[in-house]
């Protein structure tokens, strides 16, 4: 097993924000060996199907949230990734749309791992409305606060003035 820690990047953000699109871009353009851990909240792991054609080792966790009900499975998946040969240089964790990225990122400090960044993806067209929603608003605000980097996606769907207002928000 390698003595160099595996860099960990967590991708979070609410449902439909563009997490899988960002992950696919990373996989297409990366010049390093990447392992991917995908967590979907429902019974069907849609995100895993969307990234299956990309290079890299992919482990999926379905029907629960990485940060609460799947802790044992998540720990087991991390052990599997750490045992891969050759060792991946980076682990990208795509958390479910309802997960708290900060909780998931805490695993990036485990043995043999170094947390690189927590990236939160937001949908420019819907972020302000969804952030005020009585059911999901607190989750979205919490996700935004936990990000080291916030990626505003779908900016082509809003005018320049709205994009600027969201950026300042």
Regions found by a protein language model. Give the residues of each.
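Membrane-proximal helix-turn-helix segments that form the acceptor-binding/catalytic region
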Residues: 139-148
């Amino acid at each position: 097993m390698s003595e160099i820690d595996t860099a960990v990047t967590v991708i979070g953000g609410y449902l439909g924000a563009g997490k899988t699109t960002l992950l696919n871009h990373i996989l297409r353009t990366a010049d390093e060996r990447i392992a991917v851990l995908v967590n979907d909240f429902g019974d069907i792991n849609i995100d895993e199907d969307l990234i299956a054609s990309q290079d890299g080792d992919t482990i999926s966790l379905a029907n629960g949230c990485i940060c609460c009900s799947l802790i044992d499975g998540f720990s087991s998946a991390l052990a599997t990734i750490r045992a891969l040969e050759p060792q991946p240089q980076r682990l990208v964790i795509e958390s479910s749309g309802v997960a708290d990225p900060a909780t998931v990122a805490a695993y990036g400090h485990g043995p043999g791992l170094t947390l690189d960044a927590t990236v939160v993806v937001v949908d420019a067209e819907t972020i302000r409305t969804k952030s005020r929603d009585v059911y999901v608003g607190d989750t979205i605000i919490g996700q935004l606060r936990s990000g080291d980097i916030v990626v505003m996606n779908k900016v082509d769907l809003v005018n320049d003035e709205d994009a600027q207002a969201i950026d300042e928000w």
